[in-house]
Amino acid sequence: MAYDEDDGEINFNELVGNLLSSHNQEGQEEGEVQGGEQEGDDFEKIYPTSENIEPKHPDDSQHMHNSPDQNIEIPHFVDEEDELVSVVANAVQNIDDEQAKPENHLENGSEHVTSDTADDNHEKEQQQEWAHILQQEILKSDGEPLRENTERRVSTSQHHPSQRTDDALDQDDENLRMAILESLQELNTNEEEEKEPEKHEHAAPNDKLSSKKSSKKKKKDKSKNRESSKDKSSKKSKSSSHSKKHAKDRNKEKQSKPTNNENTLDLSNILENLIHENDNAAIDTAKQTVDIQDNSHTDNTNNEDVEAQALVEATLKAFENELLSSAPTEEPSQEQSIGPVSSRKAVEPPRKPTADDIPLAMLQAFKPKKRPPQEKKKTKSKTSKAASTANKSPASESTSKKKKKKKTVKESNKSQEAYEDDEFSRILADMVNQVVNTSLKETSTHTATQDNKLESESDFTSPVQSQYTTEDASTANDDSLDLNQIMQNAMAMVFQNQNDDEFDENIVEDFNRGLGDLSVSDLLPHDNLSRMEKKSVPKSSSKSEKKTAISRRASKKASRDASSVELTEVPSKPKKPSKTEVSLEKKLRKKYVSIANEAASVARKKRWAKNKELKEKEKLERQTAREERRHKKKLEKQRLAEEQEELKKIVERGPPYPPDLRLTKSGKPKKPYRRWTPEELLKRSQEAEKPRKVKKERKKKEKKMKVPSSALKKIPLFNFVKGNVQPSARHRLNDIEGSLSTIGLHKSPDGVRRILSRPKSEDHEWPLSDSSASQNYDAHLKTVVHKEKIPFHPPWTIPSQPPFALPVARRKKIPNIKKYRKRTNNSFRVSKEGTASTRNRILPAILLPIINTLKAAAKSQTAAGATPEEARKRLATIIQHAKSTVIRAALQARKNSMQAAHSKGTTTELATTASRMKNPLKMIPIFNTSRVKQQLDKQLPARSAGTEISSSESPDKATPDPHSNSTIAGHTLKGVTTPIKIEDSDANVPPVSIAVSTIEPSQDKLELTKRAESVEPVENNVETAKETQSVQEIKENVGTKASEEVTLTEDKTNGDPKNEKRILIESPVEKTDKKKPGEKIATDLNEDASLSDKKDGDEKSTLHSDAAQLTGNEPDSVNTTTGKPKLIDVSLKPLNEAKPKIPIIFPLKRPQIKPEVSVINLVQNLVNTKIPEIKNESVDLGSNITDILSSTITNILPEITATDVKNYQYEDENVKYLKKTPRQVLNLDGLVPPSGRCITKAKRVRRIKKLSADATTAPEADGKANSESITYTFDIPSPEEVQSKRSVVLKFAKARLTEAELSCLKKEINNVRKRRWREMNSTKNWEYDVKSRLKKRANAFFGEGESETKSKWIEERFQEKVSQEKYKDRLETTETQANNTKIVIDDKEILNILAVNMNNLNKARCIEKDIQESFREEKLASLQPKKKRKKSILH
């Protein structure tokens, strides 16, 4: 809206300036001014008639502008004149836009009458204000400089005789100008004094804003200028509609008031004010105008054609509007933007203004603008300089004319109805035709001169404008009318014999009101309107700036020509051929629009009602459907609940279940219980019939073996050794020998000599000449291969001199893939010596050859392709052979060492050997000895009739006692009686002691230092014997040589002298000789006695003999006789030469022995347990065999003292075994090779076992067995009394225990049941094991086949094993339990498990109480059987 108001302000300013300048130029007198006012009044009265002529103006103006007479040179004017010319050009164009609107409103006039009459009163009030503002602006802008400008223009116009049409229109211009000024003066007289200061405030900001906008938009390019011209024209057309309404008001005032010459304006004062204002504005912007003028000059040169055309159209329309609408005082802010409008501006259709928009636009025109006043001067100076260079105006005029012509065709169709019924229009058309005909004759003489001008300026036209000029070239000569002549004739005819009284004032007002809102935009298509209105707002300011570049002369000429052409060409516009098509449609629309609207409203209401009903219906349907769904869900829920209840009852009854019940894979009903639907049953049956898809086994891709390069190097190219390949594999190889024979190698030294001696010329012939000769290969000759000696050849052929081996190329070192961490300073480095020592600790030296043998055997077996079972059997046989070899080697080594020690016969050597054996190597057993423990146990209970000899100290120390247990060790080492238990088949034989008859009386003088101490009971000895981890059964030849060996062992216990013991053990080992056994023994004993006498002076120590006491099961069996033992001569007792089995202990761990337990006791116990086994095997041994065995074994074993036990490091301790790289070990029988990391063994707590009360049986009880031994007594009824198969305890436990406790109790019951099952099966398993081993032994003796002797032997051996008491009990229990396949745990045991295992005695007692109470109630109820029967019958 603001841009529209600015355009309106510019129009008035430019129009008045143009009129004033023409008035001063001609110097008209006062009378002429009055005549002009009279003419203006007349024109105002006939304003409606001239409005009808308007729609054809654009076409007429185009014809006139295309005529060659319009190409007149425009003189160069100064800046002030250019400013006035631009003002007039803009004003005239804007007024023409205003006149385009009324025609369109002829059709819609009836619609706007009510709105216009309502606003008339308000607009009249505004007119007086605007008139006052306009007058003040004219006084300011059109001051004294206008006189000087007009004088200059007169002088310059005399130098240009070509513009002879200027003088013709001066009189008309003056008349019109005076009419306008008079109307302004009359409107403003009443309120001039009140509104004057207020209007000054409004004008100043408007000037700033317009000048600011124009200066900014000057810089835009040519394309933007063309687009902006459309917007400008639309806004001007809007403003023109306002001016027409105000003109109607002024017409009323003029008819009521007489015209007074006294009210005319003083033109000299107006010019002075204008000059004064322009000078002040120019001073402030002097510096800026220079740059902007240069820019505008360049822009205007590009847009000259467009702007010239716009100027012509603007002047034409402005002059015509001035004729028709007396004094347009609509937009009084005159000094707003003075910029030019582009050529496309007038063509663009503006928005159609409504009755509401018009007063708002008028009011907003007076809002203060913020643009500074300096910019107004800037734009004026720019446009004035650019206008001086405008020489291309005719060419540019043709473009806008053509566009006007095209658009007015549409306008004519819309305005045909208005022309049809208007008689006044027809009369005016005839009059104009007459004027045009007369003017054609006068203007025909000017065509020749204007053609020359058009040709000279055609070079400057733009490409776009040249297209339009060529199209209009044919009509240019036809329409070359003199606008000046047409206007003069038209005015003369219009105002001839016309009086103001003849016209009815109401008719004029109605006609003006009908045309008030008509604009060009109403005649254009709406799609063009919408597109152009979007562009109109932002580009309006730039378009107003582009008109000032056109010279004053061109604008004058254009205005005259346009006005004359428009008046003459109007009558030819209305065309009736197309009137019927459009008007019929519009008439029908107007006729039936009310009926159609009424029908549409009725139909709309019906549709609303119908839609409402449909929505209600849909809502009800949805609601019913929702209720149905809910009901179905509820029924389904109830059905499922009923089915669940039914199925629960079925499940509680137990199997068999119905076929449609869902079951798990195990056959139990699946929760939640559900039946299969018929569809699911059908599907399951079909799936069962279908064959199952066989899953394809994915074949694992075999990984390609990576052959190392070192192996590839070793592959020979040719196998020259014929016998190297097996005959079976010869057919797989290629024909290597055949290929070698074709090569022609020289295999003899003669051939090599010939190669060296042959001339070079024979090189190419030599291989072929000697290839047929057979040569032998000499392996001693080496071929030195160089790369250059082997010529290049195809790979499928053999070179002339092939090498015997490939050259070995140097290879780059392959980087180590495995990255080792940097060794830190704190890391422990293990040396080779350390690894060797740790290996020796873990693996004794005796086992290394065995292990290497086993490894080699395993490698050979696996290399041969044997299966793991075959390799295992092979290694088993090797281990069996290794056993016997190791036993033989160990026996031989010990025998040799004993013989060497005996031959030397020195106690020092014996002491050193004993000290060496104190720290033996840790031995790892090669074979299993797990049955040794059982063999030890099975012999102890059978021997209950053993006797014991205890030594007593003599009361008289001086008297020697040959039968006493203590002797003098200083004189003899062998004259000591050693009490030994001789186990014979006879249990009543008293114990004997072996003594020597040669005892000197001097021995009685020595004192006895120690008293024999009794040994701990047999139970301790048996337990310590069991704790030793391994026992080896070794065969030893006892009868090879009779020898006696004395071993000195010391037992030191915490340094206590009381516990110190010096034990002399006499263990003569005799070799029986068939000829003289007694003699041999006697001589040996005498020799040993003489050796011991020599050692007596140095030792000076008392020896004490320790008697081993063996006790049976009963304490009464211990014999404590103090009588003299019977001497038995060794020579009298026959000795057997058989080789008995003697068990020797090789400890894996250091035995855990109490300090008071001596080694000799252990040895004697072992011997005593093994001798009966030997006797059972029908081996005849001497009575002194136990003595021999115990002495021999004691010599082998080292002494174990308390300090040794204390200082000994067990394997349990945390010892780190560090190894860099573990030795590669074959994974035999699933054994995992040791890892390379340090393995820290977990420290095990040594468990001390308590001795059981019965010494014959070893404690085998488990931890859980011990816990079961603690039992409580519970008084609950037996299952027979309760008469229930199920456990009553569990039934009552559910009420007392939580779920977790109940599940735990069930687990404990299960564990006890399983443990009992294993115990019951262990005896059976032992029986099967014994029978299978006996069968293996029988197969070795009797062969694989079955025979009576074989089965009889197996049965006998088995009965011998079973006859022992230990196994009798087991067999009896197994026989009783054989029938009971189930292991039943009764209720009392369950309560014990709850009390002991779960540590919950209180709840066990509560359950016991509950069971008793329930049992009592049942008994009471059973006393009344009749009532129960009646109830049951009724029930």
Swiss-Prot record:
Its main location: nucleus. Keywords: Isopeptide bond, Nucleus, Phosphoprotein, Ubl conjugation. A motif (Nuclear localization signal) lies at residues 683-699. It comes from the Eukaryota. The modification Phosphoserine is found at residues 1014, 1067. Residues 384-398 have a biased composition (Low complexity). One of its GO terms (biological process) is negative regulation of gene expression. Residues 211-223, 235-249, 367-383, 665-674, 692-706 have a biased composition (Basic residues). Residues 16-74, 88-265, 286-309, 322-424, 442-482, 519-708, 934-972, 1005-1125 are annotated as: Disordered. Residues 171-190 form the UIM domain. Residues 53-63, 98-127, 139-154, 196-205, 224-234, 345-355, 524-548, 610-628, 637-652, 676-691, 1005-1014, 1033-1082, 1091-1103 have a biased composition (Basic and acidic residues). Disulfide bonds: none annotated. It is found in: Nucleus. Residues 286-301, 442-451, 459-482, 1021-1032, 1108-1123 have a biased composition (Polar residues). There is a cross-link at residues 981, 1154 (Glycyl lysine isopeptide (Lys-Gly) (interchain with G-Cter in SUMO)). Pfam families: DUF3020. One of its GO terms (cellular component) is nucleus. Residues 27-42 have a biased composition (Acidic residues). The keyword Transmembrane does not apply. Interacts with PRP8 and RAP1. Negative regulator of PRP3 and PRP4 genes. This is Protein SPP41. It comes from Saccharomyces cerevisiae (strain ATCC 204508 / S288c). The lineage of its organism: Eukaryota, Fungi, Dikarya, Ascomycota, Saccharomycotina.
